Amino acid sequence: MEIRVRHLPVVSSEMELLGVLSEGQLLDADNPDVLVGTLIGVEPVSISEHAHVFEATKVLMDHNLTTLAVVSESGRYLGLVRRHDLFDRFARMLATQESGAIISLEIAERDAALSRIIHLFEQNDVRVLSLSTEAHNDAEGTIGVTIKVNVREVSRIKHLLDHNGYKVVAAFGEDEDPEDLLDRVQEFMRYLEV
């Protein structure tokens, strides 16, 4: 698989990060014999080797880069992180490869006790695989909460949340097979007759 990058770090022979060169800078160069060092002019954008993935993503987005240089505390170039690498990391953090239902809620910011939601799930033998929040810039002061759980049956999860006063905006997963549900109801009716 080919992944296109538009920004490459420029380093000295001592592995000191000198700058970042963009594809546009190379294409705009009038002289094909121009030295790379003359094309880089600004302070190099980099991230510490100890930085969190959130910080790396913020720097990439703030500077509209496709790669981000990683440097040691002494400024030595260690490597680079690509947008694609961060995307893969977030996919793992959000448990996208795990089987289960995805539920999107809208809750008032003042009621945003996520521990209550998690406790509610745990009481009902549902394990939270991932949870993320997103602030909505609306007058009502709501936030979006997206939760991935280890069960696939959406109807049970929706009922649980609705019953506890949560507004389910969307739910993705599998609903129970109506035939299975009908069979269980019939078995229950036979049980009651006995």
Language-model region placement:
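Short loop/turn microsegments at loop-to-beta-strand junctions
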Residues: 5-7, 65-66
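Short basic, glycine-rich beta-strand/loop surfaces that mediate nucleic-acid
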Residues: 140-151
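Short acidic/glycine-rich beta-turn/loop cap or linker motifs at sensory/regulatory domain boundaries
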Residues: 12-14, 72-74
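Short, low-order "capping/linker" segments at domain edges
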Residues: 150, 179-194
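Tandem CBS (Bateman) regulatory domains
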Residues: 1, 19-65, 73, 77-139, ...
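A positional/architectural concept
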Residues: 1-6, 13-18
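Conserved short beta-strand edge segments in small beta-sheet-based binding/regulatory domains
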Residues: 129-131, 159-179
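Structural preference for solvent-exposed beta-strand-turn elements
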Residues: 9, 132-137, 143, 171
